[in-house]
């Protein structure tokens, strides 16, 4: 399924924050990306409705398998590009 780059950015951010913090809530995404609470709330609703994330009763975000696959692919690509452009020489 084709998704927009903004959705990919949100999924990658959730993955990175999960690795760093363990638990992730929408406010963590707001703080990380600098977007408004309203924008992040709308995006999380769309990601949830499309089966990319789950939100528990405490507001914790969890990547579901389709979301995790996309996030890991994007994260891997960004790490590879960063490594390529940061190499000395």
Name every feature range the model reports, one short phrase each.
Residues 2-35:
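N-terminal helix-turn-helix DNA-binding core of bacterial DNA-binding proteins
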Residues 10, 29, 40-50:
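Basic amphipathic alpha-helical segments that dock to polyanions
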Residues 12, 42-45, 72, 83:
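Solvent-exposed alpha-helical segments within well-ordered globular domains of core cellular machineries
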Residues 33, 50, 88-89:
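Residues at alpha-helix termini
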Residues 48-58:
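A short, conserved structural fragment
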Residues 59-77:
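Basic, amphipathic "hinge/linker" alpha-helix immediately C-terminal to the N-terminal HTH DNA-binding motif
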Residues 79-89:
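Amphipathic alpha-helical dimerization/coiled-coil segments
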């Amino acid at each position: 399924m084709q998704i927009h780059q903004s959705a990919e950015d949100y999924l990658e951010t959730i993955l990175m924050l999960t690795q760093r913090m363990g638990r992730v809530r929408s406010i963590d995404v707001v703080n990380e990306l600098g977007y408004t609470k309203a924008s992040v709330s709308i995006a999380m609703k769309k990601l949830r409705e499309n089966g990319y994330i789950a939100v528990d009763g405490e507001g914790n975000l969890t990547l579901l398998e389709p979301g995790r696959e996309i996030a890991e692919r994007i994260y891997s690509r960004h790490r590879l590009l960063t490594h390529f452009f940061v190499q000395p020489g």
